């Protein structure tokens, strides 16, 4: 992980995709809200029945690395049979 500075705070970015369904955005938002995290940037679109999103949040000490995030997030992603990728920057 890149060390944060006051000019360049550390952030994480999540790419998430699955078949479009009701409740995806709410579940993504709730996942972060329940952990006291603020989504600082969010983009989403649908194409041919598939949902795609990218979101960012400021890093804190909740997860030490991407693998720790993956372990906690996998259950949420499995609800939608989603694929996801996270990067700590």
Predicted regions located by residue number:
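A conserved regulatory-domain signal marking ACT and ACT-like small-molecule sensing domains
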Residues: 1-89
